[in-house]
C-alpha cells in the first residue's frame, strides 16, 4: 500500500512552530534532527498507514485521527482515506488535545 501524502495548513504551521522554538531554545542541529525524524516517519506511513493507533480525540469530532509518536515530545496526527494520508497536525505531546483541535479549526 503506497498512498499519496498531503499536508494540511495546520500541520505545516505546527511543524514550523515546533522547529522555530527548537532552534531558539536548543539550536539548529536539534531542529534539523527533529525535521528528519518527522519526514522519515511520514514517509513510512505511506507503506503502513494503519500502524498507529486511533486517537481518543476522534470521538469528539467524528473523524478517525491516528497518532504516530515520532519521539517522546512529537506526534504526527493524521487521517487515512482510500487514496490519501492527510497529515493534519504535528503535535507537541505537552499540548492538550482540545487546544490542538482548536488550532486545527474544530469548535469543541
Show which residues each predicted segment covers.
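Arg/Lys-rich, positively charged N-terminal/basic patches that mediate binding to nucleic acids
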Residues: 1-37
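Contiguous, function-dense segments enriched for cysteine-driven chemistry
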Residues: 4, 50, 87
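Catalytic cores of transferase enzymes with a strong primary signal for eukaryotic protein kinases
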Residues: 14-19, 26-31, 48-51, 56, ...
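A general secondary-structure boundary signal
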Residues: 15-19, 67-69, 84-86
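Compact soluble domain cores
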Residues: 39-42
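Basic/aromatic recognition patch in beta-strand/loop cores that engages polyanionic ligands
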Residues: 48-83
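Enriched for short, Lys/Arg-rich terminal
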Residues: 70-108
Amino acid at each position: 500500500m503506497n498512498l499519496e501524502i498531503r499536508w494540511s495548513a495546520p500541520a505545516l504551521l505546527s511543524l514550523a512552530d515546533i522547529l522555530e522554538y527548537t532552534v531558539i531554545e536548543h539550536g539548529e542541529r536539534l531542529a534539523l534532527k527533529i525535521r528528519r525524524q518527522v519526514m522519515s516517519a511520514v514517509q513510512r506511513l505511506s507503506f503502513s498507514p494503519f500502524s498507529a493507533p486511533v486517537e481518543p480525540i476522534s470521538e469528539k469530532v467524528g473523524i478517525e485521527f491516528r497518532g504516530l509518536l515520532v519521539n517522546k515530545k512529537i506526534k504526527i496526527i493524521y487521517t487515512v482515506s482510500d487514496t490519501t494520508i492527510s497529515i493534519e497536525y504535528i503535535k507537541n505531546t505537552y499540548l492538550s488535545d482540545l487546544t490542538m483541535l482548536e488550532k486545527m479549526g474544530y469548535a469543541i
